[in-house]
Amino acid sequence: MTVALTRRERQRAATVEEIKEVARGLMREQGTTDVRFTDIAKEMGMTPPALYRYFADRDALLTELIADAYRELGREVAEAREQCDPDDIGGLWIAVGTAYRNWARRESEQFALILGMPVPGYVAPEDGPTKDAAKDAMAQLSLLFIRAAELGVLQEPLVRDVSDEMAACAAEKHPEQGGLVPPESFQAMIQAWATLHGITCLDAYGQFDWMTDEAREALFVSTLRTSALAAGIPID
């Protein structure tokens, strides 16, 4: 049974959300690398010391913002997967990649916060919410490869040589694969994500602004298809 919050608890939760929203707004104006309590307090009509009643320090606020961003990205990608035929692995890859790119273009500051330039001086807590949120968001990609393996349609990747270190890392850090995804395919999955992330960054940060929208879209889909074929994902 859900316990109702007291009035004070509701007010505190609302203020926490307002602080985070103001911080996101400032990041949209001045970037993600210079988040300061003084600026947030000024926007909210508060004194900087008052913010410490809600967040222990700037890093605690950044941790919440990063975790929120990963969760939002994960939800967007998961929703895209759910709208596809679960047996159409190629279609799922295009849908996942497109959702990833669309979110990055729409939320470029949040994208930069979690997958762009590190914020100077910030170190994520070792076992904090950012690690779990990031893992959950990126699990959408590994689930796609696991599904392909379950269906028996995961093909050998273009590059099949994999180091012992990479194979050990796959087994240790991603036990959810349960041996279904061989090391060479795990490596190909990381390479496919790197390709998706690379072209998304170029697009989100204006490097393709000289292209028409149609040309950008065609290039993006073509790149996803190329990376799928290299990774052993069946695609039409």
Describe each model-derived feature in a short phrase:
Residues 1-14, 235-236:
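N-terminal intrinsically disordered/low-complexity leader segments
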Residues 15-23, 40, 65-69, 73, ...:
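Generic hydrophobic, amphipathic alpha-helix propensity
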Residues 18, 26, 30-60, 64:
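Helix-turn-helix
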Residues 22-29, 72-83, 195-202:
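Solvent-exposed, amphipathic alpha-helical segments
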Residues 64, 80-110, 131-140:
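Hydrophobic alpha-helical connector segments
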Residues 115-122:
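Short linear capping/connector segments at secondary-structure termini
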Residues 123-129:
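Flexible, glycine-rich active-site loops centered on histidine and acidic residues
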Residues 139-236:
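C-terminal peripheral helix-coil segments that are non-catalytic and often amphipathic
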